[in-house]
């Protein structure tokens, strides 16, 4: 006989959340806000240029980073004024007029490190949206912009961070789609508060 959990029983839900998924999910707004704080501190200032960018290239492996790239491409491809390209490795044509976002959760992924190395060598402006550690950090040290997650959550819950980085980068390059990342964080927090374990299911 399978055990059942009353979804209106907050204590039972929290007790059943052995891997901390509920807490990790509730941190989505905080992840977005952390990106907003980094931007306010000037993290993306090196992206600004008088020269028009040719393309934004989103390089990622599998997982939430790839999902974020697909969401951004689908949601903004008809809005932004420059191409948004998703890839699993740095394109051979990348150059000084391009912006590359290297997104992932594994700082030891050799494909991401190789993309950083190639992008910086060819003069592209490179943003790393991944943990600031290991080979990936070494490959971008002093040559790439780091927007590493300031809050660590399980990889399956890092989508909010990747989306916030992508939206922020696009906003710097195209003022017509510039998002208010802090407002987005507030909206996400509001959604989380409406879906906490302490609220009745059908409210």
Language-model-derived ranges and their functions:
Residues 2-30, 147-155:
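A cross-family phosphate/adenosyl-ligand binding-site feature
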Residues 51-193:
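Glycine-rich phosphate-binding loops that contact phosphosugars or nucleotide phosphates
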Residues 2-6, 46, 140:
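Membrane-targeting and insertion segments and their boundary/processing signals
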Residues 15-25, 34-46, 155, 169-203:
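Active-site phosphate/pyrophosphate-binding segments
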Residues 14-49, 53-77:
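N-terminal, Lys/Arg-enriched amphipathic/low-complexity engagement segments
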């Amino acid at each position: 006989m399978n055990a059942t959990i009353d979804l209106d029983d907050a204590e039972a839900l929290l007790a059943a959340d052995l891997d901390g998924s509920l807490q990790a999910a509730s941190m989505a707004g905080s992840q977005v806000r952390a990106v907003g704080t980094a931007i306010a501190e000037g993290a993306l200032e090196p992206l600004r240029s008088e020269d028009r960018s040719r393309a934004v290239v989103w390089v990622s492996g599998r997982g939430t980073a790839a999902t974020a790239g697909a969401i951004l491409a689908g949601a903004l491809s008809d809005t932004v004024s420059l191409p948004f390209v998703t890839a699993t490795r740095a394109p051979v044509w990348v150059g000084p007029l391009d912006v590359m976002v290297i997104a992932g959760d594994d700082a030891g992924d050799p494909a991401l490190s190789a993309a950083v190395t190639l992008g910086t060598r060819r003069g592209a402006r490179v943003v790393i949206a991944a943990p600031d550690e290991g080979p990936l950090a070494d490959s971008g040290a002093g040559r790439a912009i780091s927007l590493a997650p300031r809050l660590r959550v399980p990889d399956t819950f890092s989508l909010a961070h990747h989306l916030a980085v992508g939206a922020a980068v696009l906003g710097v390059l195209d003022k017509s789609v510039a998002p208010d990342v802090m407002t987005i964080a507030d909206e996400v927090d509001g959604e989380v508060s409406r879906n906490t374990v302490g609220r009745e299911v059908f409210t």
